[in-house]
Regions:
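Acidic helix-start/capping segments at beta-turn-to-alpha-helix junctions
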Residues: 77-102, 190-197
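Extracytoplasmic/secreted envelope proteins and their assembly/folding machinery
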Residues: 58, 62, 66-69, 170, ...
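Sec/Tat-exported extracytoplasmic proteins
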Residues: 68-76, 176-181
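Boundary at the C-terminal end of the N-terminal hydrophobic targeting segment
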Residues: 21-25
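Acidic/histidine-rich, surface-exposed loop or edge segments in extracytoplasmic proteins
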Residues: 36-53, 141-160
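Glycine-rich, aromatic-bearing surface loops/beta-hairpins
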Residues: 152-163, 167-215
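Bacterial N-terminal signal peptides that target proteins for export
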Residues: 1-13
């Protein structure tokens, strides 16, 4: 009888577990990142790719960098121009790109002063042509918060980032291209083996400011 009673007790307890779990309050949703005032800051960055394993045509490198900029949330209208191209078509030994792109940056007093000073040089030309005041445009502020952008290679065969892009991503980090554009690399794991493609070679995370949509 004692053994039977213990079994019933265990069964009753197990049956109650789903009810107890359901009664537990749900974990609170994580707080959104703090909102800051931001401005668009345009920067120009030159980059030359030096391959050992994966080779790109000039168009291929340009398109890959364009995709990265879109992932980072660069302001529409950015440009990526090919540099140092010799081959009309096919892989290049050391293709390069010139990037002109704007990403949000926190609107500190120092940055606003710098942007206003740079834009003031264009004021006379803007007035003569009836264009908007460049100082007002350059210092226009908007709310933004930090967004984490993750890059992971080879998730599917159709992924934009493949394991063969390992050297490219590694060189972009090493050359501080992300930093020069106004992004922050917070996690960088690349396993690039010369003349060999490694599965799962790229796992990176980059933080950028993202405009907060108007309510």
């Amino acid at each position: 009888m004692r053994r039977s009673w213990q079994g019933g007790c265990v069964a009753t307890t197990l049956c109650m577990l789903p009810l107890l779990a359901a009664a537990q309050p749900e974990a609170p949703a994580p707080e959104p990142a703090a909102t800051v005032s931001a401005v668009w800051v345009e920067r120009k960055v030159n980059f030359t790719y030096m391959p050992l394993t994966s080779y790109y045509s000039c168009d291929g490198l340009r398109d890959k960098v364009r995709w990265i900029l879109r992932e980072l949330g660069a302001k529409p209208g950015f440009t990526v121009r090919s540099r140092g191209c010799i081959e009309v078509r096919g892989p290049e030994l050391s293709p390069g790109v010139e990037v002109v792109a704007a990403l949000p940056a926190e609107a500190t007093p120092e940055l606003l002063e710098q942007l206003a000073a740079d834009a003031s040089k264009q004021q006379l030309a803007a007035r003569a042509t009836g264009k908007p005041d460049p100082v007002i445009e350059a210092t226009a502020q908007f709310p933004a918060r930090v967004r984490r952008v993750e890059f992971e290679s080879g998730r599917t065969t159709l992924s934009d980032l493949q394991d063969g892009d390992c050297e490219l991503m590694e060189q972009l980090v090493r050359g501080d291209v992300f930093g020069k554009l106004g992004a922050k690399v917070v996690e960088s794991h690349t396993h690039c083996v010369p003349r060999q493609v490694t599965l799962g070679a790229v796992r990176m995370a980059v933080e950028v400011l993202k405009p907060v949509p108007a309510q």
